[in-house]
Amino acid sequence: MKLLNYAFVYRRFLLVVFTVLVLLPLPLIIRSKEAECAYILFVIATFWITEALPLSITALLPGLMFPMFGIMSSTHVASAYFKDFHLLLIGVICLATSIEKWNLHKRIALRMVMMVGVNPAWLTLGFMSSTAFLSMWLSNTSTAAMVMPIVEAVAQQITSAEAEAEATQMTYFNESAAQGLEVDETIIGQETNERKEKTKPALGSSNDKGKVSSKMETEKNTVTGAKYRSKKDHMMCKLMCLCIAYSSTIGGLTTITGTSTNLIFSEHFNTRYPDCRCLNFGSWFLFSFPVAVILLLLSWIWLQWLFLGFNFKEMFKCGKTKTLKEKACAEVIKQEYEKLGPMRYQEIVTLVIFIVMALLWFSRDPGFVTGWSVLFSEYPGYVTDSTVALVAGILFFLIPAKKLTKMTSTGDIIAFDYSPLITWKEFQSFMPWDIAILVGGGFALADGCQVSGLSSWIGSKLSPLGSLPVWLIILISSLIVTSLTEVASNPATITILFPILSPLAEAIHVNPLHILLPSTLCTSFAFLLPVANPPNAIVFSYGHLKVIDMVKAGLGVNILGVAVVMLGMFTWIEPMFNLHEYPSWAPDIVNQTMP
């Protein structure tokens, strides 16, 4: 037993040692670059899935192991750790820093919730819509962390409103009972002595009634101190928490910058297929936005039915008088919005830069019309989405956060202190350096698989899968990704599977986007467990949910997500990217055998 305790305490260390030693026969017995690269891939994948080492530290292992096995030089590996992705990430984080610093995100969220009203069903839809919108531009984690305190305040107001309503009803009950006793005493005074004698026990029962009323009051007071007044209140709290967790993830699907998995895929894809010009911010938004909207609405219906039931009559009843709960919710949201005051100069500037950046992203090369990138036609492919992000990011360090001059008491105008919208220290606190290193490690790993020939070998071995229908291959890969992402981090999942799925598509002569796009979207479908992704963990920490609640709700959302992705792939996405044809930008795989 003591040995088991030691093993449990040192489990991470033992896992690292055992993984390295157990897999070591692979490169020792099969002496080839493919086997050596496969060994490195298995070791890194094991560490990423189990988190025996921090994810970003594991991502540095290619820089150590590839030179040791003679697959790539240190200089070559190091160059893979900083790509166009990192420039795009820096620009986006500058925007996110300014949005959160000046509370623009809170203003947007509260305004959207106020627009939809406080009916429980519409309130949850309002929270989901605002959270999803913010998650398109901010990280899923920061979005969930920002919205949850507002949701918690609304949940507390719902509970207190219920207590107030019940207290009002109890007061009315006691007053009615007292009036009834006075009437009884008048009638008793007019009756005979014999009747009075018979009514003495009845008078005693009136005291009992008073005791019962007192006892009921005590019980109500006891319940008032409890966390929830009723099961419905508890279900409402669960519903709102899960709505925030899931909508922050769903909203991230919509843009390339919405979540790290989209960014990782985009950079991997552009690196492997540099001649493909079909994937950019605008085209990604056009195909993913319908997926996100449909999934958001279906998730809302599913969660509403699961926790509160779905009463169409109550939802769409016109002229309905607001309940005490709904009035309390509206008051909380209104108070939170009023605390922000009028829109400030800093918020306006941030919003303008945000809108301009989004418009430039959309119009750079939309595909159906000529974009502004033709202005740089002499250098095709040089200007990317990261160029726009950097221009916007630099503006946040240049534009002053307040007036540059002020008037003294004597009427003189003097120069005032200059401070930009954001500072480098503030940017650093928001910059996810661990994700930047993790993505760099994924690029290095993909380069190693390409240089060693492992990618080509995997592709040749997977070519027999070409006999299966394309829809079945997509479904199988989507289900595998959805299952794996529940136990491994989303960035690690896409980083591990991209070097496998790309050769698979090439080997069976299918447009790589046909398999990679649904797999990338499904990588974000980590809805089952609190540890599956940070938004789940954030909402779980508020104490309203049990694991089984998240499993039941998440299983339904997972199924809906895969179904919506499959629907999209064979309806609007297929003609958008011409997926039924094998593209010229994808290489033809020549079958290779492993020595």
UniProtKB/Swiss-Prot annotation:
Residues 190-218 are annotated as: Disordered. Pfam families: Na_sulph_symp (PF00939). PROSITE patterns: NA_SULFATE (PS01271). Optimum pH is 6.5-8. Residues 208-218 have a biased composition (Basic and acidic residues). It is found in: Apical cell membrane. The keyword Transmembrane helix applies. It catalyses: sulfate(out) + 3 Na(+)(out) = sulfate(in) + 3 Na(+)(in); selenate(out) + 3 Na(+)(out) = selenate(in) + 3 Na(+)(in); thiosulfate(out) + 3 Na(+)(out) = thiosulfate(in) + 3 Na(+)(in). Glycans are attached at residues 174, 591. The chain crosses the membrane at residues 13-33, 40-60, 77-97, 113-133, 134-154, 239-259, 283-303, 348-368, 381-401, 464-484, 491-511, 512-532, 553-573. It comes from the Eukaryota. PANTHER family: SOLUTE CARRIER FAMILY 13 MEMBER, SOLUTE CARRIER FAMILY 13 MEMBER 1. This is Solute carrier family 13 member 1. It comes from Rattus norvegicus (Rat). The gene is Slc13a1.
